[in-house]
Amino acid sequence: MSIGKIVKVIGAVVDVEFEQGKGPKVYDALKINDGSDGSLMLEVQQQLGGGVVRCIAMGSSDGLKRGLEVESTGNPITVPVGEETLGRIMNVLGHPIDECGPIGEQVSYEIHRDAPSYEEQSNSTALLETGVKVIDLICPFAKGGKIGLFGGAGVGKTVNMMELINNIAKAHSGLSVFTGVGERTREGNDFYYEMKEAGVLDKVAMVYGQMNEPPGNRLRVALTGLTIAERFRDEGRDVLLFVDNIYRYTLAGTEVSALLGRMPSAVGYQPTLAEEMGVLQERITSTKNGSITSIQAVYVPADDLTDPSPATTFAHLDATVVLSRNIAALGLYPAIDPLDSTSRQLDPQVVGQEHYDVARKVQQTLQRYKELKDIIAILGMDELSEEDKRLVSRARKVERFLTQPYHVAEVFTGQPGVFVPLKDTIAGFKALLDGQYDDIPEQAFMYCGNIDEVLEKAKKL
């Protein structure tokens, strides 16, 4: 192991000098033993020549000074993988942070790995039922697919993610890996206790690099979580990988890029934005051994879906769930936009002709209502034809029937959550669009599960 010394510290960036010809490679991990309890890890980012390497710190660089000894580990950051990680909370380096003692005898993987080759990859068209009406109907998820939850601040990304975890991870017999990338520590804490109460903690591995961590940590924590998921997949398991939030991964890359002195590109993002996103996303894939189904929350800055970060993420996904501030403002939750959300699985050959026809009819009805809104605002409902009046009435019922109470929001709403089977969802919307419930008031459709609940509620109105 070669030993170097610190020659320069600028925030999270540390320059280390090694003997000429004995310097570490790019992405190698360096260890600083400063005499305190923990040791700080650095990751090599650039070779500056003359034996000097520029590194990013994986923890706080407070207290570092020039002349401190740095030891090269000779390989990239390695993290524990396998059964021992289940039920544990780890940081970017794979160290336990849940005060439950060390992680037992373990296999370790490097966090920088190649994506599976073309021959190894497999695609699946099996559907993953979520129990959320609007998702199952409009943008169905594929087992082994990549799903993005897009939304601005405060429209419900994390609540939707938690509901999906509740409905899928608890019912799903496989394993889950939850990666918190630059999000609130409180959310990570809530998630841990929720899983514990549900009795599924022994099927979940958690990796957290939260908002207060330095950028190097937030940039690498997604890779740590993915590496743990890859190990389970390679053992032939079906894994759920939850990433909250993929935008913070991009943001950490922007910070690191600026610290390293690279020229920024559009909107101040790093010039390597597409490559960094590709390196992560291409590894999240299913092979002939096992599958990784990934659900990622994507923050949309200023509600602008054309921002380079969400726009780059779009290209990698099989299904996109777009959360709308306008729908949230109407008090319709989940605030998922059925006209903006898409899925590659919404194909008659995958979901069946009936499902496809009902989903498209729902979208056509809502689209026509959207077009008529301007006329209604100027001239009022009376100026519409009888057919359009009927369509508007049905569209408003469809909008309300797309809402449903969530299990994870029970504590706020006081209304018990519901899981709606796909066949009930299709049957309900089909009957609604065929005019079977034209005489039922629209408020009866608010926050119900299947159509039977609507009929029960209508009797009480």
Swiss-Prot record:
GO terms for molecular function: ATP binding; ATP hydrolysis activity; proton-transporting ATP synthase activity, rotational mechanism. Its EC number is 7.1.2.2. Transmembrane segments: none annotated. SUPFAM superfamilies: C-terminal domain of alpha and beta subunits of F1 ATP synthase, N-terminal domain of alpha and beta subunits of F1 ATP synthase, P-loop containing nucleoside triphosphate hydrolases. ATP binds at G151, G152, A153, G154, V155, G156, K157, T158. It catalyses: ATP + H2O + 4 H(+)(in) = ADP + phosphate + 5 H(+)(out). Pfam families: ATP-synt_ab, ATP-synt_ab_N, ATP-synt_VA_C. The keyword Cell membrane applies. InterPro entries: AAA+_ATPase (IPR003593), ATP-synt_VA_C (IPR055190), ATP_synth_F1_bsu (IPR005722), ATPase_a/bsu_AS (IPR020003), ATPase_alpha/beta_chains (IPR050053), ATPase_F1/V1/A1_a/bsu_N (IPR004100), ATPase_F1/V1/A1_a/bsu_N_sf (IPR036121), ATPase_F1/V1/A1_a/bsu_nucl-bd (IPR000194). It comes from the Bacteria. CDD domains: ATP-synt_F1_beta_C, ATP-synt_F1_beta_N, F1-ATPase_beta_CD. Keywords: ATP synthesis, ATP-binding, Cell inner membrane, Cell membrane, CF(1), Hydrogen ion transport, Ion transport, Membrane, Nucleotide-binding, Translocase, Transport. It is found in: Cell inner membrane. It is a peripheral membrane protein. Gene3D superfamilies: 2.40.10.170, Bovine Mitochondrial F1-atpase, Atp Synthase Beta Chain, Chain D, domain 3 (1.10.1140.10), P-loop containing nucleotide triphosphate hydrolases (3.40.50.300). GO terms for cellular component: plasma membrane; proton-transporting ATP synthase complex. Produces ATP from ADP in the presence of a proton gradient across the membrane. The catalytic sites are hosted primarily by the beta subunits. Belongs to the ATPase alpha/beta chains family. F-type ATPases have 2 components, CF(1) - the catalytic core - and CF(0) - the membrane proton channel. CF(1) has five subunits: alpha(3), beta(3), gamma(1), delta(1), epsilon(1). CF(0) has three main subunits: a(1), b(2) and c(9-12). The alpha and beta chains form an alternating ring which encloses part of the gamma chain. CF(1) is attached to CF(0) by a central stalk formed by the gamma and epsilon chains, while a peripheral stalk is formed by the delta and b chains. This is ATP synthase subunit beta 2.
